[in-house]
Amino acid sequence: SFAEEHGLENYRDAANNVIIRKPASAGYENADTIILQGHHDMVCEKNEGVDFDFLTDGIQIYVDGDDIRAKGTTLGGDNAVAMILAILSDDSLAHPPIEALITADEEIGMLGAFALDCTKLTGHKLINLDSEYEGVLMCSCAGGVNVRGKLPVSFKEATGTAVTVQIKGLTSGH
């Protein structure tokens, strides 16, 4: 495994969450442990009419300007785990103790995060590296929630004239 090849302590739980620990570099031994978090699952979607099996076929990638894209499918990965592995493998970086937390089944409901035994982690500061945009840092909390509600509805026969209203070009925070 990556962790074993780099001489790093590692742990995998029954939900397939992975924790990899890297000791602090010289001079940072007493610093707080930082948890770097990402997820290892992907959205398996393909374009209409594309014959592709995500369990057996390899993603066909190509470069489009500054972007890497996939032919007919989702690209297959977020960059969080790649960033974490790059940090863990670079012995030239000065850093506090690091715990890499790589969770499972984020895309289908954060199942790995919900199943995680947090007592396995020693750090109290977590940086979630799962973001939509390169070069953008979000200060927020990570989480997910499903809400189910019921609203009593009664239907009536439609009368009058249907119209469509469009409002465009306004400045907004969303």
Language-model regions, residue ranges each:
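Short, intrinsically disordered, charge-balanced linker/junction segments flanking boundaries
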Residues: 1, 58-65, 166-174
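A non-catalytic alpha/beta surface segment that caps or lines the substrate-entry region
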Residues: 1-32
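Structured core elements
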Residues: 11, 19, 35, 128, ...
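Short, ordered beta-strand-loop transition motifs
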Residues: 11-15, 62-66, 159
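Pocket-edge structural micro-motifs
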Residues: 22, 38, 63, 72, ...
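Fold-level recognition of mixed alpha/beta catalytic cores in primary-metabolism enzymes, strongest
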Residues: 95-172
